[in-house]
């Protein structure tokens, strides 16, 4: 057995971390080991070290076996203090550390000893810096790079959070307090103001990897492994070892690094940061006495100090001068996103015993004072929280009450508290004061689940928010624009409003001179309801477009074309496009790229544009650049950009990937298919076992949604323009999008109207006053933009800084309906709704046998997979030629996003779900012969934004017919209570609140509606059919009149048509409805012959279908008179159908012309091979 095979005996490997994370969530904590599997990408696989097998892995290391292993440091488990030292020697250009590596290690240990002595004082004897285990990685290919790992086995912290606090405070002590610049160096790079310490201060986060001793990175030589070493003088000196190592210049000249052998080590497991015993709940927990002592001292001394993980360096002739990031007024460009790392707070010290573990209800702001004492906040060194707490609630509590609370813990005179309160009100006058900070502080101390906010600070939307009724577009609200005029319309509006190169802090500004324009747009008011002074009316404009209309009318294309042109002109700088699907994101990128290249090659553009900006088209979603075409777009755009010149950016992102955008600011944001984006927030709520772990599923989904919404709102508030493009707007979804545009609270209603409305409902005066005050504060803060203006004094002797306060003006959103006169007919002229799913499947099988190109849409992936396997097995057994079946699932889209459309074009039968989503355009007209759609009502229905638009993206099948079946997924649900609750939601006159609140109510009402629909099949069917019919219709002209497809409901067929033996009459009925539907009721009356024949002249397949009575003696005459018999096609295979109810019978015959004319076809039951549709539904579905 090989060495690698022996290694697997102790470690159980997994492909990714998802399964390991699941075991952690279930409470199983094991030692996780990682291993390099790819040289270039650095990819790793992860495994769990079996309990009791740590010794086996240690033996492998002791034998010198290099498996490229890392230990994963569990974030919430005890861990030994460790340092990762990584630095370079100083080169000829002055970059790097100019001290020998052995002396760097000694100086680091000395400063660490002094820092710990400062923290724990008289207990400093408990820590000895020489009790350290060191490993070194010598790189033969890069001898100037030095890497050391230091582990202190006797210092154990309870978790990584405590260790992170200690290490960052140590960095603050070195570079801020002592200015120990010898332990930092300048890095190479474009930004020469950046530097770093000799030890890494950033790896103390969740699930970090630490390379094990004796291991190297994959692809590196064996000599690059981490080997144990010792500093000779450090280990051999007994008394005052630091004094012996330091010469007159403060640097040791005698320290030597000596490599150790594994045989010289007492215990190799001591070199691990987290041995298995630290993670074993059954083992004795490690002692954290010294770690706790150090941590408590760190909290006391550095609890309110902003700590940094980076240092900034400036190079001069004397050497390297290091300063902490944040001390200078100007932050280095590459570090603007660096976050302050304030030490964690021990909230338990603020808990009052009488409220411990109890439920807390906050009905008014004064109750906050009952749970906190100012003296405790001060004594606990929480002054930061104390001052913000006062500022957050002082506007809603009488001054006398606040002073009583403040003086009750203050030894000074009351005038001191009055002065504090005055400063608190003054400092908070420029901030949105809503009482949120006080509430969050209370939740942190007593727990989120134990605190209920009953103040109702802002009216909440309680309307009937089912989001299932489509918007009726009228000319009064929506402006009709022909598709070819959309681009020119957007360009005209932008040319009128935007001023090129007129950016102020990222905002394009404009001035208003006429009072009438303010009246139309709406001017912000102050707390007393007075309008803002004219001097402050230099406002940045903000605009929103809602673009709806026909499917296929080029709404998105027209918008993207205008956006590219505006960016090239410099009228837009940074643009963000958000889509719900990967396929749509790729098509958007390719469309942008095509338009960009066309404009660059247009001589008219070069003549009309004074200056054209280069555009960087980027993709920001998971595995984006694994796609070859997207990667080519990126390389082409980056090749044109001059790094010394300013360029513009267009970023395409998925709704679930906006966290990758960090803190970027975009002046224009486009939401393509926003309804689907909103629906995706609750995509994980649908689960089979709704009674099991339902609360956990909801909590996880809401948590994920909150993070996305908060990030999304942050982008929209900083942007100047928003575009919402969708063909299926609903009134509720429009309100959701408006909340993204306006902000958390609506600006349409003035505070005085809020006041009047609440008083009419009997709300108390105090509540009305506080509520209006909160709304005013929030509205003003969202609108406000503070700009620092520098001017010279009259004598021009000094510069004067002055704050210029401006407010944004929010214009009314423009509602645009796009129509195309060339699309006169609906996408589907006829919708055939099958009551029985078996009938639909019979039609599908027959269509496949005829050789037609078919697309089948299913509402769930499971349904699509089962149908795919059933049809695949059926065609392999029954057909002489095998059609190419293509299954499009979520994994297909993720693995091969660029090949999805090509697969759709190449396949014969396409099975897919809503995973492709909206926007998946198929350019070929009539690519498919027939379309089928199978919808199963579930919690995710009846909103069919994905399914409807996906079927419509086929544009028009050749026969313009959609075969559809709607079924119910659950039966027997008692929804009487849910029905009453649903009807209890009555529309109110409240304006809609925040985007997050609207989503909550959307989900709650829709879920009730879904359950009602599940129990009442009629309601669901009517709602879904209405949605489908409206969506698949087309706008006829500028009057917005809509042409809807013809609807046919296939139910029991009149038996009088089946009683006759007139073939002509039967064929007329088949054309009116469906052939198989007629035969299903009387199987013994008919035999269906389906033949596949090859045309000798044209070399193509021709399909013929013959329907005759089974007992008709003139079968051979009908065959001779048929088109096949007259034109002399050569039969290949003949298959005879005999259909029963829920049965499809097929018999194969090899025939030639003589047999077809002389032999009478008699089918006996014992010779037939049957397929039971019900049976394969049960077994295969």
Swiss-Prot record:
One Pfam family hit: DNA_primase_S
Family of the protein in this entry: Belongs to the eukaryotic-type primase small subunit family.
Name of the molecule in the record: Putative primase
Keywords: DNA replication, Transferase
Positions with biased composition (Acidic residues): 1163-1181
Protein species of origin: Ostreid herpesvirus 1 (isolate France) (OsHV-1)
Enzyme Commission number(s): 2.7.7.-
UniProt function note: Synthesizes small RNA primers for the Okazaki fragments on both template strands at replication forks during viral DNA synthesis.
Origin: domain of life: Viruses
Disulfide bonds: none
GO molecular function: DNA-directed RNA polymerase activity
GO biological process: DNA replication, synthesis of primer
Region called Disordered, residue ranges: 1141-1181
Keyword Ribosomal protein: no
